[in-house]
Structure formats: structure tokens, C-alpha cells
Amino acid sequence: MTKKNFNDEENESLLETYNKQQQKQSISTTNRSDQKFGINNANKQFSLNNKKSINGEEIDEEELIEDTIFFKFKLDSKQRNSIKLFIQIVSLVILAGYLISINALYFSTNARSIIFYPSINSNTTDSGSVSPTSTPSPTPTPTPSPTSLLLQTLTSTTTSYDSSEIEALNGGTFNMKYFFYFSTFDILLISYFISLFWLLLIFSDSFIYHTISYIITIIALIYNVIKSYFTITQILSINNNIITTSSSSNEIYNGSDSYLPNESPLFDSLKVREIIIVIVLVGIPLMVLFLVLHIITLQLSFKKYKRLSDKEKQFYNQSNEEKRLNKKVEVKHSNLKRLIQLSRPELPIILAAMVALVFSSLTSLAMPYFFGSIVQVVATTHSFNNLNSSTLALVVIFVIGSISTLVRSWLFYLAGQKFVARIRRNLFSSIVNQEIGYFDQCRTGELLSRLSSDSQVIQNSVTVNISMLFRYTIQIIGSVILLFITNWRLTLLMLGIVPVLAISTVVYGKKIKQLGKQFQDELAKSSTTGEEVISNIRTVRSFSKEQKFIDLYSKDINGSYLIGKSLAVATGVFSGIVFLVAQLAIVLIVYVGARQVLDGTLSTGDLTSFLLYTLSLAMSLAFISSLMTDFLKAIGSSDRIFEIFDRVPAINVSGGKQIQNPLGEIELKDVEFSYPTRPNNSVLKGLNLKLSKGTITALVGPSGGGKSTVIAMIERFYDPNSGSITFDGIDIKELDPVWYRGIIGYVSQEPVLFAGSIKDNITFGNDSATMDQIISAAEKANAHSFIEEFENGYDTIVGERGVRLSGGQKQRVAIARAMIQNPMILLLDEATSALDAESEYLVKQAIDEIMKDRTVIVIAHRLSTVINANTVVVINQGKIEEMGTHKELLNNTDGIYHNLVKRQLSSDD
């Protein structure tokens, strides 16, 4: 067996292949990791040469680091999720422990003082026993406050107690049954809040779901505050009742010790203050800690990046040498957050609209209260004065609400129109500033769809929908608060539907966002097909392919229809679930509320108000679910738009050096190039070419050899894969593209005119040109005579792409457009091929005149175009095969140029 030996070149090749594989593997791993944590990788480019822009600045990844409090720990996804789960458990233990303590304090207080409530129908004996049949000593009944009346419902579930219960109360025990019920409820409620928060984090990393998570967290904290307030208020009420009763009834206060072991009020003023202080001092830090833990959870859910300081860079690079792959990273925020940031210029209008929105929402919240008042008047007092005042209040509320709604709608719509107009301007700017290679890869119809369809979806979301979202959010929060005030038991019963709605919303939201993006993609396909057919209708008609493209367009439309059908099914299922759950909840609330009315614990007016608030809440939830659909569609559409926003052009449109006194010499050195759409197919292969000032260079050769590519490279439509192109010895990559292209006159093989007048198209090369200069340029291009024959002369509209002019007329207008620019370099891509012999001769005379002291490159298959060139360059398969004058190359009978001329002369004969 012989051992295979590798030379140095083979070793270097193997090493290079291995490094590329490792780099691809690392990039793939990074992409998967970033996608998991919500980083959009659509525009990430890992290249040794291309930099990515962060806030307008190009930064390498080695200068960036994860900007979270955990970046030094290098946590993977499993470790992050484990920490998040641990935080949720700690949060649950903290809040549950706090609420259990509150319940223990509350029910202990209630048990020690319940014998002083006048509702207890019990008698005492001298021995301290209690007899249900004995007559209690008369004691003054304290007048409770409205708050205490509301809070006493927690304990006034019975109106009489037997002796064993009183003895248990006298012993200082508390009602274990109710303590267990309420503590269990609190634990379940907080568990629900935390579980919902966790579900939202698991199902999505988007900004909107994390915002909902924050709202849920705040609701949990508000519940804590309400619970603490109830406890403090009830303790104060109990303490006041004890003091009042003991001071007015010596029989009870000075009776047997079995009534009250301590012959003093349960809490004096000092102790009450101490209890309140303890609740506040313990509760507030716990709430802050709870919020901090959730902020940490969000920190673990997103990867953010910051620029390293010199000290951090040194530390990070020393400990992470494997990170030195020179990859580029682009930082992106969630699309919703970016849309909000883009709307900052409209912030004053939005704030004014928000004020009107608050008034509009408050009037909606006030209506159920006054409707309930009217019902209560009809059911009880039958007072016309109360009826009139309540009705008048409703009329005033309606007027205020109408005016507020008018102002709100107007301002939000105005802000939305300004916002979307700026989005479209920025999007169009981003599109036209991309390099030419980008347009080779993207279809025109798809880009037009981004400008029209996707922008329209965003417009609807940021105008009407955003105002409605804020309005219904305020109504939901206000309705929940007023429901708690009206009857907290029924409110808690109603909130049982929230878990079902929340989980449905999360699952539905993910599905809608996915379908929304697919729907916009299919619309873009159909737009592309339609644009191509309409713009090339003459070709379609000449081949009688109308039905073929109708079928193709129908196929594209059918694709969007199928996705739209899935979207409709998802929307229908979600709406059905929401409606069913909401209606069942209303039926249950009506039943329980009616029982409370029959028991006398709830008034008819309060039940009416409660039902109206419930209906308002249900309608608001239903509207928000519909708005969520539109928002998720908008987010899906914004994905496409922000991909264009974030894409950094490979070739800048401006910025760079400007040469004060240019000579006009161009040199191509070892240029290799392949088009972005065909990266494996080399078009230019090590091409070397020098173009001197004032010389005419003709490029000839078989079709597909690379002649037009050379023109595109000189114009810097593309950058070479390797090698360089210099202008007066300076690489054109260092030159200002605006200045550089300003000294180049270009006439393409298929000149394109814009849908304006002939004058507009000629002045496209020089916006400041006078009418005399326009006419002079047209005369030099032999275009003035046919322009004057038109009824409107130079103001004649040429139609889309110059469709109203003949091929020769379009060519001459394009030449005039190049001439008026007074360029230093002329690029003529078969510029006279569309002219007849006489026009070509006249145009050639004009071109010969403006060629003096200019660098000229001309591509032509016609012998007459290149016969007077200083140098003829034969390009075949991306290489220069021959170079010399026309006579020199013609004398080479075996050369490509000789054969080309011979074939053309034969065809002319």
C-alpha cells in the first residue's frame, strides 16, 4: 500500500475547504439560536467583506456583545428556559405566601370581632353560655360606611351562630373554612396569572405578546393592592365597631370573659397603624420584586447587543478566541416596536387623539351606571326627579362622547396618513438605493406589492385600528374595575373565561401571523404576473398568449384564495369560541346575579349595571380579537417592508472621493465577475483592459461573451468578485457614485423613456438645462426634426416606456439625453442599431463631434460603428481574445474578428 502525499497547494486547498465548512456550521448554529430568541435573520450576511449597519454605523460582530445582564454566563436556550421557569415558581411562592398571610390576618380579625356585629342573633347568660332563645341586651347599632357594607359581604354569609361557634370565636380562633376557600382562590388566581405569562413567553417572542404579559403582571399586582386595601379597610371597620360597641354597651364589654378574653378593644389605634404599615412595607417590596423578576424573564427571552468598550473587548476577545470569525451581525427590534418608533413625529397628534379617546371611553363606561340608576328608580323609588336627572346625565354623556369620537377619529386618521406616507417614502428610497444586482434577484411586481399592498395593510392598522385598540383597552380595564366595585363575586366568576380566551388568542395569533405573511406573498406573485403581462401586452398579443397568462394569473390568485380560506376558517373558529364562552359566561352571571337579587344581597339596578358592563367588556374583547387579526397581518406585512429597510446596499449610492481635474482614463485589472443570479457562472475571467483619454474603444464578439457586462462594470452597476476597476488610478469603489456617474453618458441597447414629455426625458440627463441646450442636444442626435412634427413639440407625452414613439425615435431621444449631460465618458451599447442608414450617418457625425477629448466605449455588431475606433477589443466567453485596430484584426484571417466581419459582409450582400 502506498501512502498518498499532499503538496502544499493541496494542503492549503483542503484547509480552506475545512474552514469554510466550519464557518457554515457556525453560521447555521448562530442562525438557529438567534431565531429561537426572536432575532430576525432575514437580512443577516456573514461575509468577510460586507459590513452590516447598526443605527447607520457599520460594526463587526467582534465589537458587539449581548446587552443583557446574563451575557457573561453564555446561557443556551435550555438554561434560559430553566431560569425563567424557576423565576415563575419563585414569583408564585412570593405572592401566594403574601396573600395567605393577608387572609390569615383578615379572618383572624373577623373571628375575634364577629360577636360585636348586631346581625348575630344570640343571647348570653351569666355563666357565659349562649342561648338562641334568650333576648340579647339592647345595644346601639353603629352606622357602617359604604366601604364597610361592601366589605362585610366577605363575612355576612350567616345571620345566626350557635354556642359552639361563639365559643370557638371567643377562644380567638378564626374561620378555617373561609380562610381555606379564599387562600385557595388567591393561589389559583395568581397561579393563573403566572401561567398565562409563561404561556405567552413560550408561544411567542414578539413584542405584542410580551406587552400583554406585562399587562397581566400589572393586573396581578393590582389584585394584590386591592386585597391589601380590603384587608386594611376591614380591620379599621372592625376596630371601630369594637370601640363603638364596647363604649355603648357595658353589658357586652364588661360581661363574661368568654365573650372577650382581653377586656379591651381588639386593636387600638397604634396597633392598627402598625398593621397597616406592615402590610404596606411588606406588600410594596414584594410587588416590586415580582415585577423585577418578570423583567429578568423578558431579558432572558431576547438577545440584544451593544458595542463593546475597549476593556470589555479585550476581556471578551481573550476569553472567546473562537468568536473571531469576522461575521457581521445586524440588530433588529420587533416590528411592532419599530413601527411605534417610526411614528414619533406624529406623537403630538397621537397624544391629542389619546385625550379625546379617554373622554370617549369614559363616557362609554358611565352609561351603564346611569342606565342602572334609571332601572333602580323604576323598581324602587318611582321618583320622577331622579328619573329626569339620570336621563339628562345620559344626554350630556352622549353629546360629550360624540364630540370626543369625532376628534379622536379625525386625529388618529390624520396621524396614520402622515405615518404611512413617510413609510412609503422611506420604502421607495430604500428600494431605489439598492444595487442593480438586487433588482436582478427581485421581481418588479413583488416590489410594487410591498409599496402598495403591504403599505396599505399597515395604513389600516395604524389609523382606525390603533385608535379602536386603545379605546377598547381602556373600556376593558374600566369595565373590570367597575365590575369589581359593583359586585366582586360576580366579577371573579366572570373572569373564569379569561384563561380560555387568552390561550385561544395566543394560538390564534401565531396562526394568523403565519397565514398573513403567506397571503401577502401570494398577492405579490399575482401582482408580479399582472405587471409583466400588462407591460408586455404587445408581445402577449402577438403570440396570442392571453389565455395562458389568464390561467397563470388565476393560479396565483387561487393560491391567495386558499390561504385566505384558511384564514377565514381560523378567524371563524376563534370568533365562535369567543362568542360561545362569552355568552355562557353571561348566562351564568345572570343566573347567579338573579339569585343574589332574590336573596337581597344585590339590587336590581346594580345587576342591570353589572350586565351592561359585562356586555361592554364582551364587545370590547370581541372587537380587540378582530383588531388583533389586522395587527398580526400588519406585523406580517411589516416583515417584508423592514427586510427592505434593513438591507444595506452592496454599493452605496453616494459618498466618496471626487476628483477635481479628472483625466478620464479607465483601467480594468484582472476583473472576474459573475451575476448574483448565477454565482457559479463566471461572465468575466481575469479581464484586463485600459481605456485612454480621448480614445474610442469598440467591444465586439459573439453574443453572451461579456461586452455589456464590461459596460455595466465601468458604470459600477456591479462590483467585481476580484480584481479592480480604476479611474485615473483610483479604485472606483472609493469614488462618489453620484459624481462618477455624473461624468458618464450612457445609451443602453434598449433605451427606456419615462412616461412624461420629450422635454422631460431629455432633461433627465441635466435638470438645469435650458431650452436652447435641449434643442441643441436634440439637433445633434438628429431628433429635432421629428419632434417639431408633433403637435405639442417638445411637450409631447411619450407614454409609458416611450410606447408612443418608434424604435428609432426613442433611440435618438436617448442619445440627446446623453449628449445634454456633456459627459467625459461615453458608453454606447449598440446605440445606433435602431436607426436607418441616413439617421445613423447623421447621428454618427454628431457622436464623432462630441467624442473629442472624451473616453468612449462602444458596443456594436455593425461594421460601420467600429470601423473608426482607435482600438477594437474582441471579447469571447469573458476573456479578451484579440485587441488592435480594425485593419490589424482584419488582417488576421484566423481571428474571431475577421470571421465576424466576413459573416456580416456576407449577410449584407
Swiss-Prot record:
Subcellular location as annotated: Membrane
Ranges of Low complexity composition bias in the record: 125-134
Entry's Gene Ontology cellular component terms: membrane
Occurrences of domain ABC transporter (ranges): 666-902
Binding locations of ATP: G701, P702, S703, G704, G705, G706, K707, S708
Stretch list, region Disordered: 1-36, 125-147
Membrane-spanning segments: 85-105, 182-202, 206-226, 275-295, 347-367, 392-412, 480-500, 572-592, 607-627
Primary location recorded for the protein, binned into one broad class: membrane
Residues covered by the ABC transmembrane type-1 domain: 350-633
Topology in membrane: Multi-pass membrane protein
GO molecular function annotations of the record: ABC-type transporter activity; ATP binding; ATP hydrolysis activity; ATPase-coupled transmembrane transporter activity
UniProt cross-references to Gene3D superfamilies, sorted A to Z: ABC transporter type 1, transmembrane domain, P-loop containing nucleotide triphosphate hydrolases
Statement: the UniProt record of this protein carries the keyword Magnesium: no
Record family assignment: Belongs to the ABC transporter superfamily. ABCB family.
Protein name: ABC transporter B family member 1
Species the sequence originates in: Dictyostelium discoideum
Gene: abcB1
